[in-house]
């Protein structure tokens, strides 16, 4: 996953992001067609495909952090997207039946999966910033633990931010990236198995199917500047928009 192993004829950033969008859509359609922890083979297959999304998202947060000209603008865009996506996520999760409690954290009686993965991605971006601060290791650790707490209610919880930190902090060491991500995802799998569903917990290990795809990353954003200008707003708009549409379908079908 490091820049030192770029594939000369691989996939550009836009292509990988489109794959992530496709996998995410398949996953969310599965939640709509097969509510709960369905053991239907098609549901399991669709959810397995969906596990490709989060690692690709995490990886490109680290790329965005590395290449951005303005961290503040990048963080603000993610923050605004996280706010919009929260309501789309709740609307989708509750089949269009949401009330005023949508504005209250943990109002639905659960700590996990209370808001979208965008909040977790923002937390990961902030962890990368903390890691580069000129302060003591103790201060960095305290700030990172605080961000873990803040991102706990998000989809993928604090695991996605910690994976982002691991990838960004080991940019030239793909072995370390993989080891740390395996460690954090294993923790997530254990918690999922113990608190939610064993089979769906084990299903989270399918995130590592994304590794061969990320190894094909050629280090470029896209094939043309004109297409890049179209793709950037698309990537930001698609997440909340598709959740809202699926929420409408769940509400009326």
What positions do the PLM features span?
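Alpha-helical transmembrane segments and their immediate juxtamembrane cytosolic regions
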Residues: 1-253
